[in-house]
Amino acid sequence: MWRQSTILAALLVALLCAGSAESKGNRPPRITKQPAPGELLFKVAQQNKESDNPFIIECEADGQPEPEYSWIKNGKKFDWQAYDNRMLRQPGRGTLVITIPKDEDRGHYQCFASNEFGTATSNSVYVRKAELNAFKDEAAKTLEAVEGEPFMLKCAAPDGFPSPTVNWMIQESIDGSIKSINNSRMTLDPEGNLWFSNVTREDASSDFYYACSATSVFRSEYKIGNKVLLDVKQMGVSASQNKHPPVRQYVSRRQSLALRGKRMELFCIYGGTPLPQTVWSKDGQRIQWSDRITQGHYGKSLVIRQTNFDDAGTYTCDVSNGVGNAQSFSIILNVNSVPYFTKEPEIATAAEDEEVVFECRAAGVPEPKISWIHNGKPIEQSTPNPRRTVTDNTIRIINLVKGDTGNYGCNATNSLGYVYKDVYLNVQAEPPTISEAPAAVSTVDGRNVTIKCRVNGSPKPLVKWLRASNWLTGGRYNVQANGDLEIQDVTFSDAGKYTCYAQNKFGEIQADGSLVVKEHTRITQEPQNYEVAAGQSATFRCNEAHDDTLEIEIDWWKDGQSIDFEAQPRFVKTNDNSLTIAKTMELDSGEYTCVARTRLDEATARANLIVQDVPNAPKLTGITCQADKAEIHWEQQGDNRSPILHYTIQFNTSFTPASWDAAYEKVPNTDSSFVVQMSPWANYTFRVIAFNKIGASPPSAHSDSCTTQPDVPFKNPDNVVGQGTEPNNLVISWTPMPEIEHNAPNFHYYVSWKRDIPAAAWENNNIFDWRQNNIVIADQPTFVKYLIKVVAINDRGESNVAAEEVVGYSGEDRPLDAPTNFTMRQITSSTSGYMAWTPVSEESVRGHFKGYKIQTWTENEGEEGLREIHVKGDTHNALVTQFKPDSKNYARILAYNGRFNGPPSAVIDFDTPEGVPSPVQGLDAYPLGSSAFMLHWKKPLYPNGKLTGYKIYYEEVKESYVGERREYDPHITDPRVTRMKMAGLKPNSKYRISITATTKMGEGSEHYIEKTTLKDAVNVAPATPSFSWEQLPSDNGLAKFRINWLPSTEGHPGTHFFTMHRIKGETQWIRENEEKNSDYQEVGGLDPETAYEFRVVSVDGHFNTESATQEIDTNTVEGPIMVANETVANAGWFIGMMLALAFIIILFIIICIIRRNRGGKYDVHDRELANGRRDYPEEGGFHEYSQPLDNKSAGRQSVSSANKPGVESDTDSMAEYGDGDTGQFTEDGSFIGQYVPGKLQPPVSPQPLNNSAAAHQAAPTAGGSGAAGSAAAAGASGGASSAGGAAASNGGAAAGAVATYV
């Protein structure tokens, strides 16, 4: 028993499963393809003239089981199989194919698709035959119109369906060719009539017809008829007098109707002369034109595309042409509509015992009526259902059962048409199933992402999403109707596991998915808009940032299309993903997009490129030739993205066929015609060139030729001049007139001249070579006045303007006299003085008296360096300002004319006082720490006296102003000093530092620089310094040294320093005071014959850094000994030099006596003549053996100067000062160079002073080797120490130098 029960239960379960399997997917039919509501046209082939044109009536549906199809025609069942083979149905579809259309196929068709669950209904379509009849066969008519008046051509168009499109055209009477009419005076109304706003003589049709055409777009055919010949009756008055006020020709109905969504055109056609202008307004407001509302027929109609209810209103056209009263006409436009859904019914799937509502709402004008269809029949005819409630807009069914499954249709109808939709109700019982489970989804932050979860079931399952035991509802989470989860504005915290949960009353199911969130891609450097001239390169840069785990690809697009870099080699994507376009052209203009793309997202940035090129060549449209002018007409052909600025009209003539000249430049860019004057007796052609900011366009094609008639010349030669080239001639010159100015054949010049004295007769000469530009008249007196004129003559006569008489002169000769009594009246400054002279007579000048030239030079410059000052000829004194200060100046004066200088006066000389110096030659400032500079400069190029020192000023430079100017103290009173430390400045501040050199006359011009101090090195100690040392003369038996601070060349140098020393072996250091104003320190009071240890310490703020220790022995001679200043008279070097000189002279005398006693002769002067004169330098050589000079006192003047230190010495200022090492303190900046960034030099070890080395080495070259050898011998025996040797050498060199000036 139990076994039988088990088997029965198993069978029941199997049957239930089978039933469920069978029901799964069953549904009523649904129409998927159907005819559009309205009409469907077909074409019937005419007898043997054309082939058949099959057409189809579509009907397709889906459903389970597959639906079966049936048709009704004109409300009755339609058996398409009864039509032989002319009709067939597509397999598996309901679509009818009519292969051979016939007239009886016309009618209303409707398709039904049925299965066991319901019947779906398609739209009803009216199938109608398209046809076009022919025009009546009539001969061409001749009609007469009056010039200037409105006129109409009426078209009797043939019948057809749909109504044919009517047009008027022009048909040539000879070959029958057809041209369309596109004319602002001719307008076609909707009824096919052609309206002339006014008739002109050109409208007369002597060799053509006006013809009316009717076109059927569906049939692709047109027909022509109503041919008209138009005769225009001329009024015999000018066009400016033939005027007519506006007159109404055709207007739309005052009450016009438009359909929503359709095109509507309102007409307002008026005639009149001149052509009337039309202004449209709506409800009193002028219409703003747009893409949807435009003007048609040159403003005579208003076109509305896709009309809507807001377009209803009163439209008014106001018409005027300046003649008579303005006219107006108003049209009231109403907008109706075929029905359209505002709420469509939707397919419903539900379970038993549930409730379903179908809702259908529609609008339209007139208001539509809604009716319901059930399984292909009006719902009133369907089986009654007490659970079903039907109203105008809804169907409600409660307590659903399986038998409620079926199709429901909503039909909204008014007098203009209908709208229909068929849906179904499917009653099922299925537990939830997941057809597409959630997957592992990746996205980037900031975007929206959707995790799919597609479920099936009946009733429709409720889908919810779960994450970490929390239901996801609201906020950024949105569960869509199909079950998918949308997360908006994803963040990194959204990454993780997500669960999709589906449930209905028959069961539940769930599935898991996951979300990975990565960093979004972004553009960090966007390309910038670029404007470039054609031919240049353009570069767009694009940088991005993206998630490191994703691969990135950079692409470039132009105008929405990817750039093919292989096909376009001018486009290059570089390694940094920039886009470079080489040799740009106008067509490269457009929008360029940088696309940074990963597999998850992309970022874009756009920039526009405008490539501007020269304009296209203008197009000449015509030329009008008149007697003496031509009017050129042209059209511009594009500005290539840079507006046209102006035009240039060029011409050439038969005289210069290979060249083009400008007839007029800068023709305004708004002009398209221009009138150009022409010369007589020439053939002209013209062309036009357009200009924009890029340049000139190619020229237009040249115009036809314009020819002008001969005439007299319109001018005489220009630039007539009479001026002699020799003292005894007169040259008359002029500018030749080009052939374009000849104006007729046999052109020549008629040259006339005469003396400008009473009763003088004109002399004449004809010049027949038009290229000749002068005539020479010989044998004339020197510099006399003439009257001259040159006349242009041709076959037609003399020029029509009188020739101007020009004054000329024969040739000039050299002035005879020099100014006398040339004196310096008063010296007013170091560079200026008043000079006076006795003038020369004008007769002695023998030419145009231009004035005087004062020539001045100095003793050092010589006459080769003279300067000239020009003075007017009507004065006899002048203030001259070009003298050299503190110098012997020379001057002379002469008169001059247009060609020659006269003889000069006697030369005078005078001494000028000292002046102020020129600026120093250079100034540099090198930072020392954060609050000091080391300044270095070079002496002025022109001291203009004896330098007395320098003054230094400084001022702080702010962003918008300069601070107070201050003099740095102490100022420098020794002219030999060319460097100084400037301390006490602010860190990281900009200063303007100025320096002036001084003489006893005051300060010279300043030289300034601007430099910034270093930033304050907070918590940074100076780098390790070093130092050098020099031994100074002892003080009361105690040793003394000078310690030179050498700051670090590698790091922070420090701002100042101090010195430390101790006796070697002791532990206590003795510290000197901090030295803040100099870079050296003198340390005295040291025990003799003692070894000391020295250090220097660099200081900056609270930080000190010590140098390495150096040992110095107070009895050493390794360091240079610096000698205090002493006078020449008691200087040891001077005494030694005098002794050495005396020894050399005695030795030389002995040698000469010995040679003479031997009979030998040593004529130095003759030997020098044989070898040629040599130019020896002033500082070397034995000039007493040279050829005697005229100025015998020159050498003696230098003897006294040898006792004074020279200002412009070859040694540097510190060496002259006597307290520095020439090896380390030269003016070329070898010491200061240590502070130049990047060019810092290592410390230089002390070297002995050797100021006489150059002179000592030069002595053999300047004089005899014997003298030099003696000097060397004296130096060698002067002492055992190197210091003594140096002194002896100094003496020898000094002796040689003195010998130069003896």
From Swiss-Prot:
Biased composition (Basic and acidic residues): 1172-1182
Top-level taxon of origin: Eukaryota
GO biological process: axon ensheathment; axon extension; axonogenesis; cell adhesion involved in heart morphogenesis; cell-cell adhesion; central complex development; dendrite morphogenesis; establishment of glial blood-brain barrier
Cellular component terms (Gene Ontology): axon; dendrite; filopodium; lateral plasma membrane; membrane; neuron projection; neuronal cell body; plasma membrane
Domain Fibronectin type-III: residue ranges: 614-711, 716-813, 818-915, 916-1017, 1021-1119
UniProt entry tagged with the keyword NADP: no
Localization (cell): Cell membrane; Cell junction, Septate junction
Transmembrane spans: 1139-1154
Bias kind Low complexity: ranges: 1253-1275
Gene3D superfamilies: Immunoglobulins
Job description of the protein: Essential for septate junctions. Septate junctions, which are the equivalent of vertebrate tight junctions, are characterized by regular arrays of transverse structures that span the intermembrane space and form a physical barrier to diffusion. Required for formation of the hemolymph-brain barrier (the insect blood-brain barrier). Vital for embryonic development. Involved in the targeting for degradation or recycling of certain septate junction components, including kune and bou/boudin, by regulating their endocytosis.
Name listed for the protein in its UniProt record: Neuroglian
